[in-house]
Structure formats: C-alpha cells, structure tokens
C-alpha cells in the first residue's frame, strides 16, 4: 500500500503519462474546421438596361415580390392628392338599371337658364314726302312700331283755296267758285295709323 503512487491530479502533467502507462489510447483534441474561402465578387454590369417593348410598364426589382391584391391596369398612374380622380366605369350594370327612365322636373335653375333677355331697340323710320301721296301706303308707325297700311282722309288745303279765287276772278262768283272744294283730287291727303290713330304724314297738293 505504501509503495503505490499517489493518484494523479486531474488536468495535471502526470495525466497523459498515466494513460500511456496503463496502455490506453490517447485521445486527440478536435481541430477547428478551416473557414471557407470567400468567392471572388464580380462587379455589376454597368451597361444600359434592356429595351422594353411596353413603355408604360415598369419592371419590378429582382428581389421584390408584389403583395397579393387587385392591381391598376397597365399604363395607369395614381393621381396626386390634389388631383380629381374620376370613378371607374362599372363593367357590369346593376340589377334593375336596365329599362328604367328617370324624369327630372324642371326647377327654378333650368327656368332661369332658358330665359332669354331681349333688348328693346328704338327703330327710327325716315319717311319721305314723295311716297305719301293720294293713296294708302305700307309703312311702320312711328308711335306703336307696327307694320301698317296708312288710313287716308281728305282735307281742304291750299290748292282748293287758290282755285276758288281763280273762279271768282273769271266771273264764277254765284256759287261756282266752291266747286274746287268738293273735289278730293284737289284736297290735301292726311295719312294716319289705323291702330293708334297717330298722325303720320300730310300730303299737301301744291300748284
């Protein structure tokens, strides 16, 4: 008992010697695996992008996958916040929309829009004395502004008075001098409006 060696201290210098002494195989420490060598990095191609047949289509990034959901049609760009976006026309008509007529009664706005403003213009008619003679004339009344045919009346004028004086001078003084006063072709002609009785013109017969 006294000749036996003391037990080895774990981890001490005599531990491997004890294993060799007893004939046990020596365990080798595991070696660290070498790091893989880095692959050479190829520089990116800086050439022009490939030509796309659709100019309105924007190709997504190689590593980007669009989320599932409805998409806008090709060539459509979303409007800005201040821009009005018209609603999409419905592809399918709503049930009951076919054969339905909606009648909108005219309101005050439509009545005011249909009202036309007419300006009243004053027409100045220049009447010439030679057209107003012993017969009615078609003209426009200067008072009521209506197209009319004048109403004529015969009045004793200067022509009748001169012919009466001439008859008295030649000796027709026993009532024969009054004969020119009853002849309408020797009297003055007054033209008036048949509607408003307005005096338009007087045609005076001169010698």
From Swiss-Prot:
UniProt GO BP: apoptotic process
Domain LITAF: 121-205
Compositional bias annotation for Basic and acidic residues: 18-31
Region (Disordered): 1-54
Family: Belongs to the CDIP1/LITAF family.
Domain notes: The LITAF domain is stabilized by a bound zinc ion. The LITAF domain contains an amphipathic helix that mediates interaction with lipid membranes.
Cellular component GO terms, alphabetical: cytoplasmic side of late endosome membrane; cytoplasmic side of lysosomal membrane
Bias type Pro residues, positions: 1-13, 41-52
Positions of Zn(2+) binding: 141, 144, 193, 196
Protein's name according to its UniProt entry: Cell death-inducing p53-target protein 1
Keyword Metal-binding: yes
MF GO annotations: metal ion binding
Keywords tagged on the record: Apoptosis, Endosome, Lysosome, Membrane, Metal-binding, Zinc
């Amino acid at each position: 008992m006294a000749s036996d060696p003391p037990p080895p201290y774990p981890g001490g210098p005599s531990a491997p010697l004890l294993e060799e002494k007893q004939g046990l195989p020596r365990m080798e420490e595991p070696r660290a695996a070498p790091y893989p060598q880095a692959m050479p990095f190829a520089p990116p191609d800086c050439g022009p992008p490939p030509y796309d047949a659709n100019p309105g289509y924007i190709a997504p990034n190689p590593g980007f996958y669009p989320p599932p959901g409805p998409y806008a049609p090709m060539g459509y760009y979303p409007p800005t916040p201040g821009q009005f976006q018209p609603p999409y026309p419905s592809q399918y008509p709503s049930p009951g929309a076919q054969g339905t007529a909606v009648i909108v009664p005219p309101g005050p706005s439509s009545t005011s829009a249909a009202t036309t403003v007419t300006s009243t213009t004053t027409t100045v008619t220049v009447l010439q004395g030679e057209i107003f003679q012993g017969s009615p004339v078609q003209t426009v009344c200067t008072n009521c502004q209506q197209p009319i045919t004048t109403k004529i009346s015969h009045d004793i004028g200067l022509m009748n008075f001169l012919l009466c004086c001439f008859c008295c001078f030649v000796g027709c003084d026993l009532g024969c001098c009054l004969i020119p006063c009853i002849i309408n072709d020797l009297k003055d002609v007054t033209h008036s409006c048949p509607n408003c009785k307005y005096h338009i013109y007087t045609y005076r017969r001169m010698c």
